[in-house]
Each structure stands twice: as C-alpha cells, then as structure tokens.
From Swiss-Prot:
Keywords assigned by UniProt, alphabetized: Endoplasmic reticulum, Hydrolase, Membrane, Transmembrane, Transmembrane helix
Predominant cellular place of this UniProt entry's protein: endoplasmic reticulum
Signal peptide: none
Phenotype of gene-disrupted mutants: Impaired in BABA-induced sterility (ibs) and BABA-induced protection against P.syringae, H.parasitica, and salt. Affected in the priming for callose deposition.
Location(s) in or outside the cell: Endoplasmic reticulum membrane
UniProt-listed Enzyme Commission number(s): 3.1.3.-
Name of the protein in question: Phosphoinositide phosphatase SAC6
Domain SAC as annotated: residue spans: 128-456
Organismal lineage: Eukaryota, Viridiplantae, Streptophyta, Embryophyta, Tracheophyta
Length: 593
C-alpha cells in the first residue's frame, strides 16, 4: 500500500529576500525546492549554498508543502508549520495539522502600476488569515488517507506504486486545487495530500485479545462550506456537508472496516440568515429536484453500490416541506439498489428517548446484513466486502445524524467482532465497561469535529453519544452552543465561506468576473452595520427611559421620550425588515437577496 516515491517527511524552510528554499532533512539525497518570491516560479536545485544573499535568511522547520495559491498580484506558498502525531491508519503514522502558513511571493507589488491589485490582494490576505485557522486537517507521508481500507486493498499493483496524490480520491483531497502548480512542475516528493475531517482511535483489551478501533472522517470538498451558506445540492448533485465515515477494527491480524456517509438533502434549497433564530427554508428550482437527486444517487451507486437513504428530519413545519420534496424526488429513484427510509427523529425520540433508535435499526437491519462490511483475514485475503452504504441526513447532518450513525456503527462493530470470534453470540460492547466508555468518547469526538468545521460549535446532543444518556449539563451546553451557532452564522460565517471558496478554488481570482472580493455597495447595504445599529437602539432606549422618569418636570421630557423611543423603534424595525443585509454575507459567491 505504500507508494514507491515517498513524500519528504522532514523539511527545512530557508526564507531569503528573493526566494524560498525548501531543503529535505529526512536523510534523503534529494534536491532542494527553490521558489521565487518575485513570481512564484519553482525549480529544483542541488543545495542551499547555490542561493546567494547579502542578508541572513530566516530558517524554520516545516512538515509539508500544502500547495501554491495564485492571486492577482502574486502567489502564496502554503506550508505546514506545526503538526502532531495522532495515531496510525492501517499501520501507518497519521498527523494532524495544528498550524498553516501562507507565505507571500508578492514582490511584484512594489511596481507602482500594481497599486490596484495591491488593494484587492489586501482583502484576500484577510481571508487567508481565516484560512490559516482551518480545523480538522490530517495527512500521512506513507498512505493514502482519501481511500477506504477496501479501496486501498482493491488498488492494482501499479496504482499502489504511484505517488500518493495520483492515488487520491479528488473529492476528499482538501488541497486538490492548491496542488496544481506543484503537479505541473512534477514535484511529487513535495506534494502532501491533505484531508479535512476527523481521526480518532483507541486500543482496548477484551479478554486476552487487544483490539484497535479507528474512526476516520473524510469531508468532500466539492460543496464545502459553512452551515447556513452551504445547504442542499448544486445542479450537478454534489451536496453540502458530505462526509464519509469509516470505522476500522484490527485484531489478531484481522482488519475489518465499515463505511457510512452523511450529506445534505440532495436538491437545491437554502436557508439564508436574516437575524431570526430560524430563517425560513426556501426550495430553489423545485422542478429540478428529481433530476438533481437522481444525479446524486447515480453517483453514490457508482462509488458505493446499493444505497439506503435515512431521512431524519421532522415530518411537519418547515422541515416537513423539505422532507416531502425529498420523498417525492425519491419516488422516481428507489428500486432494488436504492431505498428511502424516513424516521422523524424528534417526534419518535424527543429530546431524551434516544433508545428508540432501536425502531430505526429494525427497519434497516436487513439492508446492513445484506451489504455487510469489509474483512481481511490474517493473510491479507479478502473474506467479505461492503456492497452498499447507509446515507444519513437531518437538516444540518450534524446532531441527529451523529447520534444515529454512532448507533449504526455500534451495531456493525458488534457484528464484526462476532465474525472475528472476539464476541460470543449474545455479547455486546456494553458487556465491557472500558470498551463501551472508550467507544462513546470516540464517536462524541468524531461528531464534535465534524460539527465544528460546519457550524463552528461542537455537536448538540453530544452528551448522549458520550455518556449514553442526556444530562442537565449537556442540555445547558446545547443551549450555549445553539446561541454560539446563531452568532457565528449571522456575523462570522460569510467571511469564513469566502476563505473556503478562495483556497479550494471555488472562486478563482485570475478569471473571476469580479476582480475584487468586495464590490462597491449601494444604498442601505453600504451603511448597514449591525453593531452600530444595536448601539443606536440601546442608547435611544436608555435616553427614552431617562426622559420618561422626568415627565413630571414638564412636557418637554415627554416629547424627548417619544422622540428617543421613536428612533429606537424605527432603527429596530429597519434592522428587522432588512435582516439579511445586516448579516455577514459571502462576497465572492454572492447569495440571492
């Protein structure tokens, strides 16, 4: 499974005034990579000594080259400046990125004719500062993290010898766009494939057996984004918050994995923030829903085989309209290899009775038993393969989805352990307290990671996944996280969405119609500022209150009170009527008003 051409696992970055030089320090005798700070051009050189400079260079250790991002006035070299080991995937070390750095190759900005580009790039630089704080990024120098254990096993011998980026599944390659320049320059040993998602593992003893459990998530980059600015599907059927979750168990030479997926309802719908707690759901081009859903499930069948779509949204209200549209679209798709199953999570389970998910499992048990899981014996021979996939969704594909997926994962892990011979016929994970506690924590951390990337906060209902029951502390934490989501969705996620679109190539600066990320605003949009509006409302209300207290001193105070109250009400009404304008909105891909 290991690529013949290994990626450099140790690097030293030399920062000269006119160039960056990346020197391998992993014991190989490979060439150094020279990157011009004037135009971002690249070439291989024999040694750092070839670089002449009158100034002492800045030297630092780095852990990989993520890619090169081209902007109007120059390019940015993207490198890993901090990382940590988080475990192993099929026996190969895995690392988490703790710090990214975008290094500018922008000396061309000193040209006075480039002043306009400099102003525009300053705006993009602010987005890159947001991108540097991207969470949940993982890499390996030795193995392809974008592929499941089953797909890795099924790779042909020739494919296994290819560089890791050539083996990679593009939809799960977070830095796919930024690697293009390095690929064009044939710099395979410097190309570091990165995924976004989650990676956690633990080891436990069951009797005399040592069992390793790993849970890895791979986020699709095709429609990546934030909770409120990336909903539903695009016209090609790619959905928001699409995450592939793989659970791997290794014991006594056996390796077994089970894969499931989550993703937004596969038709075009949105929920544009407008300062209300729950913005309205809007179905876009409803006549296209069936076609887009069909395209989505056709893609899933090609990649995973049979599909069971589990829809957890409410049957009534705004969610009900979406669920009805989803069910209607599925009528034209369902057959022997695609099933649709609706389970009103909130109606059946409420806020505390999550044990009722057993009802859902009974309805999907035949599908899971038929389509199974992947299993290798001690000799590395395939004994079973997974033939289908469970696709779970709620509105956000976070909280209800994670509770449900953890239940499915638990049931399948018990089947796997019985098949390997670790568990007896009636034995369950709950029969082993330490195993049970570690497994709950594994899935709780997994859900939090995915939720933070999409919504900005840990998952709701996480206490049930972590402890097996709802707790008062968990309910209070959910309330706090819900408020935090409201703030982030309304006042921060527009900028974060722009940063995602920029680094993943969804908005390409050089060819985009709008050359600056922030077009000129007109009318109310040009002056709309929520903090200022809120300040005016509060100050006006305070003056109105003070004037009311002095009404007895004369009618003048009554008039002042009415004026200040009127200002407060008028500004509040203006903000309420134009809530979308007062929110933090993406500028690169402008949403509908």
């Amino acid at each position: 499974m290991v690529s013949r051409l290994k990626i450099h696992s140790g690097l030293r970055l030399w920062e000269f005034p006119d160039q960056y030089v990346i020197e391998p320090t992993d014991g190989s005798s490979a060439s150094c990579l020279d990157i011009s700070r004037l135009d971002g051009s690249m070439k291989l050189i024999d040694q750092v000594a070839e670089c002449n400079s009158l100034r002492v260079p800045k030297i630092r250790s780095i852990f990989g080259v993520v890619g090169m991002l081209k902007l109007l006035a120059g390019s940015y070299l993207v490198v890993v400046t901090e990382s940590e080991s988080v475990g192993s995937f099929l026996g190969h070390p895995i690392y988490k990125i703790n710090s990214l750095k975008f290094l500018p190759c922008d000396h061309s900005l000193e040209n006075p004719h480039e002043e306009q580009k400099k102003m525009e790039t300053d705006d993009y630089s602010r987005l890159l500062s947001v991108a540097e704080r991207t969470t949940g990024l993982y890499f390996s120098y030795e193995i392809n993290l974008t592929l499941t254990a089953q797909r890795l096993h099924d790779l042909g011998d020739e494919s296994k010898l290819l560089p890791l980026w050539r083996q990679a599944e593009p939809r799960f390659l977070w830095n796919n766009y930024m690697l293009e320049v390095l690929i064009d320059n044939k710099l395979d040993q410097f190309l570091l494939p990165v995924i976004q998602g989650s990676f956690h593992s633990f080891q436990t003893a069951i009797g005399r057996d040592i069992v390793d459990i790993t849970l890895i998530a791979r986020r699709c980059s095709r429609r990546n984004g934030t909770r409120m600015w990336r909903r539903g599907a695009d016209p090609d059927g790619y959905v928001a918050n699409f995450v592939e979750t793989e659970q791997i168990v290794r014991m006594n030479g056996y390796t077994s994995s089970f894969v499931q997926i989550r993703g937004s309802m596969p038709f075009m719908w949105e929920q544009i923030v407008d300062l209300t707690y729950k913005p309205k759901f809007e179905i876009v081009q409803p006549e296209e829903a069936a076609r887009i859903a069909e395209r989505h499930f056709l893609d899933l069948r090609k990649k995973y085989g049979s599909v069971l779509a589990v829809d957890l949204v409410n049957k009534h209200g705004g969610e009900g309209r979406l669920s009805e549209r989803f069910a209607g679209a599925m009528q034209h798709i369902t057959g022997d290899d695609v099933r649709y199953l609706h389970f009103d999570f909130h109606h059946i389970c409420g806020h505390i009775h999550f044990e009722r998910l057993a009802i859902l499992y009974e309805q999907m048990e035949d599908f899971l038993e038929k389509n199974g899981y992947f299993l290798l014996n001690e000799k590395g021979e395939k004994m079973k393969e997974q033939l289908g996939i469970v696709r779970t969704n709620c509105i956000d594909c976070l909280d209800r989805t994670n509770v449900t997926q953890s239940m499915i994962g638990r049931k399948l892990l018990e089947l796997q352990l019985k098949r390997i011979g670790v568990f007896g016929a009636e034995e369950t994970i709950r029969s082993h307290q330490n195993f049970d506690e570690c497994y709950k924590i594994l899935w709780a951390n997994h859900g939090d990671d995915i939720s933070i990337q999409y919504s900005g906060t840990p998952a709701l209902k996480g206490d049930f996944v972590r402890y097996g029951q709802r707790t008062i502390q968990g309910v209070l934490q959910d309330g706090w996280n819900a408020l935090a989501r409201y703030y982030l969705n309304n006042f921060a996620d527009g900028t974060k969405q722009d940063a995602i679109d920029l680094v993943q190539g969804h908005y390409i600066v050089a060819v985009s119609r709008d050359m600056a990320p922030v077009p000129r605003k007109r009318g109310l949009e040009a002056v709309a500022n929520f903090p200022v509006a809120l300040t005016v409302i509060l100050i006006s209300f305070w003056f109105a209150t003070m004037s009311v207290k002095q009404v007895g001193s004369g009618y003048k105070h009554l008039l002042f009170s009415l004026v200040w109250a009127g200002i407060s009400v008028a500004v509040a009404a203006l903000v309420r009527a134009n809530g979308r304008i007062f929110c933090n909105r993406p500028s690169l891909h402008k949403p509908r008003s």
